[in-house]
């Protein structure tokens, strides 16, 4: 669960150019929720994403992840929990590197070995399958420099990269589970430690029995040992609370209408399949209605409408235009 609590942000404070970007804004986004955000220029949309990602800090208020205050967490540490796609397709990829190299770096983001792009056969096949799902032919262009791809291909690749990250170590999973658990931290620590110890002891016992197995070949023992570890690993990864939150900052605005539609369809597919908590800024009212479970409307640094469920499904572009007109008239 993501909470934006009583956030105020003022730019150029105390000068003739003073601008209140956010005025005591609060909202909560539940796990797996897909929120579209609309509003005019300077209404506070991008400032909200900048504060969530840690690019800038609020003057007042804060950001909470599963009720844990991360307001003062640095941008690089917060990158484990937030992934962002910008309007410019060139921002999300390294143009002088190959498609597969870009994916490899994204796949190691936040990992203990840092950045790098060593790729084994298994990873290469995994990347090909991921790219195949984009239906853009990129699975056949693994060694192509991203700089020569079309804007749509590059943005689709950026979107895929944003959802990738290195699998956290077991130690990191246990630590984050305690940190971000909603209830009593000590109970959470005892619970996850018990699960880990029991699963690890079971894995050790199975591998010891495997060594004593006389009728099994070395190859079969190796294969079985890998299967035992996979079962152990899956038990621990059930406690991983750090699935990334996706921040989309007008990520189709620089694309032609046909390509933008394709990228939006891919966005919907990726978000739903991975159950990603997502906030998507758009100036396209039709897209704001079509996509997502919930719509938030900003005006002059405030949230003036927060629409979800059946109410959102019944929305029309005319409804949204009327809401904007009402907001403007209220200030006259």
Where in this protein do the model-derived segments appear?
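A short, flexible loop at the N-terminus of ABC-type nucleotide-binding domains that lies
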Residues: 1, 10-24, 74
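Helical segment within the ABC ATPase nucleotide-binding domain
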Residues: 261-273
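ABC ATPase NBD coupling module
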Residues: 69-83, 91, 113-120, 124, ...
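H-loop/switch region of ABC-family ATPase nucleotide-binding domains
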Residues: 282-283
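The feature captures the beta-strand-to-loop junction immediately N-terminal to the Walker
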Residues: 38-40
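Helix-to-loop junction immediately C-terminal to a conserved catalytic motif
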Residues: 53
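Conserved beta-strand-loop-alpha-helix hinge in the C-terminal portion
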Residues: 302-325
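Conserved ABC transporter NBD signature motif
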Residues: 61-68, 307
């Amino acid at each position: 669960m993501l909470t934006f609590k009583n956030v105020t942000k003022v730019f150029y404070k105390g000068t003739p150019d003073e601008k209140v970007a956010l005025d005591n804004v609060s909202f909560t986004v539940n796990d797996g929720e897909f929120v579209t955000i609309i509003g005019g220029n300077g209404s506070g949309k991008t400032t909200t994403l900048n504060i969530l990602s840690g690019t800038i800090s609020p003057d007042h208020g804060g950001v909470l992840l599963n009720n844990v205050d991360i307001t003062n967490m640095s941008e690089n540490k917060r990158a484990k929990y937030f992934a962002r796609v910008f309007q410019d397709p060139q921002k999300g990829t390294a143009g002088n590197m190959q498609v597969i190299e870009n994916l490899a770096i994204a796949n190691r983001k936040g990992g203990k070995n840092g950045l790098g792009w060593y790729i084994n056969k298994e990873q290469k096949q995994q990347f090909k399958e991921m790219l195949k799902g984009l239906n853009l032919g990129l699975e056949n262009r693994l060694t192509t420099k991203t700089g020569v791809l079309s804007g749509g291909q590059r943005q689709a690749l950026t979107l895929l990269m944003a959802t990738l990250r290195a699998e956290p170590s077991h130690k990191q999973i246990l630590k984050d589970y305690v940190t971000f658990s909603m209830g009593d931290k000590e109970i959470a620590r005892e619970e996850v430690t018990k699960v880990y110890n029991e699963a690890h002891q079971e894995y050790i016992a199975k591998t010891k029995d495997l060594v004593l197995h006389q009728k099994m070949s070395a190859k079969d023992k190796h294969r079985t040992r890998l299967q035992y570890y996979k079962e152990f690993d899956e038990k621990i990864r059930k406690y991983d609370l750090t699935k990334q939150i996706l921040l989309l900052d007008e990520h189709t605005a620089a694309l032609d209408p046909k390509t933008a539609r394709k990228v939006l369809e891919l966005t919907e597919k990726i978000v739903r399949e991975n159950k990603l908590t997502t906030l998507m800024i758009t100036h396209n009212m039709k897209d704001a209605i079509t996509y997502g479970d919930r719509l938030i409307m900003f005006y002059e640094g405030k949230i003036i409408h927060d629409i979800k469920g059946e109410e959102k499904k019944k929305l029309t572009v005319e409804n949204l235009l009327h809401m904007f007109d009402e907001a403007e008239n209220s200030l006259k």
